[in-house]
Amino acid sequence: MPALEAAFRATTYHVAAGRELFDLRIGEANPAFSSWLKRQGISNWAIITACNPGSKLAQEQNAAETRRLQEKIAQHAWRHAPARNCADAGDWPDEPGFCIFDADENVLRMLAVAFGQTAIVCGSADDGRGEIVWLNAL
């Protein structure tokens, strides 16, 4: 899994929260995002996508799966913002997704597994730092 971890780390996770756009990186603090989260009363966050399940390209089904994920988020009434995961090298298509706020991480993990995902990115308002949460143990 080292190559997959390297790919996650070589990605910028863009979050469009209201009028703000935040560029998040695995393992890197983001004081502006942390400050925004605290102003909104948000304590934790996670980025999830429905694209390319199992880390295999699936362009033809990505749009439909993203809509289905958005419906699941609405059913839970989770606060969220649009996100886009962009590989730094441009060697993987951008993946639309969502940054979900203050949801139970275990529930998000199960949701991501249901969409065939390998991992999600989670963090807290403490410093806005995102970390990879691998889902293969579920």
Where are these regions (language model features)?
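N-terminal, charge-rich interaction modules
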Residues: 1-72
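Short, compact, well-ordered microdomains
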Residues: 94-97, 101-131
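Mature, function-bearing regions of proteins
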Residues: 25-30, 71-74, 82-85, 89, ...
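Amphipathic protein-protein interaction modules
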Residues: 63-107
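A general structural signal for short secondary-structure junctions and capping/turn motifs
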Residues: 38-39, 90, 110-113
